[in-house]
């Protein structure tokens, strides 16, 4: 039993989720296969096809790794999103020490040995922080706003610099596999759990090929998921706004009564009434939407539907 436990911690499983990366998957495989030669421990690659519709899977199945100890392909039944794809990969990971990287080669591969070393030193979690990367002004602004809001209202331990990936040990892996959350952030779930951690800043690279699949729609969903799943701030905000509007309504009503008593000839404020009603109904609908987000996620969790469905598994290190 002890030998088996030591064997599981003697290497690292690297989860690689991808979506329509036919232009760059070959370069990624060549690069990481060559890099593995510099490592003193084995790694296992777990590729997760998150509903690709191009030739990425076909190219991957045709590639033959020379230095990677084990590589496997997990194909999901449809596109579930990168966080669900990572969770799917973790359920199939053979080693206790795990991480995930993108197939676009933006993450430095040096995070693999450095993260592994920190885990062997006794840390449970190693956060890889983006230090330098060329991104658009809009993406940089979104990242800063997201980081600050999450740090203040959801998970206080979240790095203001932004975390791209995480290296973690078997305790975290077991926790994630036993608590597979849908409509959630896997990074915030790890941070929210605590454990002994360390942050390593690293220089990231520009995307080698193709275009990013990280669309604004997906960013907005992550933003909503992060707060609804890990913070009561939206509900508290609704309560505060409701209290402020209630107080404002009383003040406006008193002012109207006093004005009428002082000067009966003062006309009734039709435009003021319309503005107040429009504001009130607008806030009410927004509040209902926020509450509905919580209710929907609670209902979705209660149904117990799977966060992902694995359609196919294939060993890429076994010749056909």
Show the residue positions of the predicted features.
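Hydrophobic helical membrane-anchoring modules
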Residues: 2-9, 185-320
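Structured catalytic core of nucleotide-sugar glycosyltransferases
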Residues: 2-135, 149
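Conserved protein kinase catalytic domain
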Residues: 15, 33, 61, 87-90, ...
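Short conserved micro-motifs on helix faces and helix-strand junctions that flank
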Residues: 17, 76-78, 166, 239, ...
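Residues in soluble alpha-helical coiled-coils and helical-bundle/repeat scaffolds
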Residues: 20-23, 106, 110, 177, ...
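Generic structural signal for secondary-structure transition and capping sites
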Residues: 34-37, 98, 124, 154, ...
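Acceptor/aglycone-binding surface of glycosyltransferases and processive sugar-polymer synthases
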Residues: 74-78, 82-92, 97, 109-184, ...
């Amino acid at each position: 039993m002890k030998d088996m436990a030591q064997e599981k911690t003697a290497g690292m499983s690297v989860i690689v989720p991808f979506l329509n990366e036919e232009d760059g998957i070959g370069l990624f495989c060549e690069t990481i296969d060559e890099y593995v030669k510099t490592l003193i421990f084995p790694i296992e690659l777990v590729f997760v096809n998150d509903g690709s519709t191009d030739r990425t899977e076909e190219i991957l199945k045709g590639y033959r790794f020379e230095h990677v100890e084990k590589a496997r392909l997990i194909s999901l039944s449809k596109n579930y999103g990168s966080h669900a794809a990572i969770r799917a990969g973790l359920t199939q990971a053979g080693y206790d020490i795990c991480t995930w990287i993108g197939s676009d080669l933006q993450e430095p591969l040096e995070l693999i040995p450095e993260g592994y070393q920190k885990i062997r030193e006794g840390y449970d979690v190693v956060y890889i922080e983006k230090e330098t990367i060329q991104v658009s002004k809009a993406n940089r602004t979104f990242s800063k706003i997201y980081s600050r809001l999450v740090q203040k209202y959801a998970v206080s331990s979240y790095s203001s610099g932004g975390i791209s990936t995480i290296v973690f040990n078997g305790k975290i892996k077991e926790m994630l596999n036993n608590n597979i959350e849908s409509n959630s952030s896997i990074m915030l779930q790890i941070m929210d759990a605590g454990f002994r951690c360390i942050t390593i800043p690293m220089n990231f690279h520009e995307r080698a090929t193709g275009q990013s699949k990280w669309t604004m729609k997906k960013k907005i969903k992550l933003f909503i998921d992060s707060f609804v799943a890990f913070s009561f701030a939206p509900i508290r905000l609704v309560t505060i706004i409701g209290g402020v509007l209630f107080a404002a309504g009383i003040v406006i009503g008193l002012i109207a009564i006093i004005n009428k008593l002082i000067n009966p000839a003062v006309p009734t404020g039709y435009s003021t009434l319309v503005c107040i009603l429009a504001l009130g109904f607008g806030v009410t609908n927004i509040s209902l939407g926020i509450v509905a987000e919580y209710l929907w996620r609670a209902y979705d969790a209660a149904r117990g539907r799977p966060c992902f469905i694995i359609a196919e598994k294939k060993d890429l290190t076994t010749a056909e």
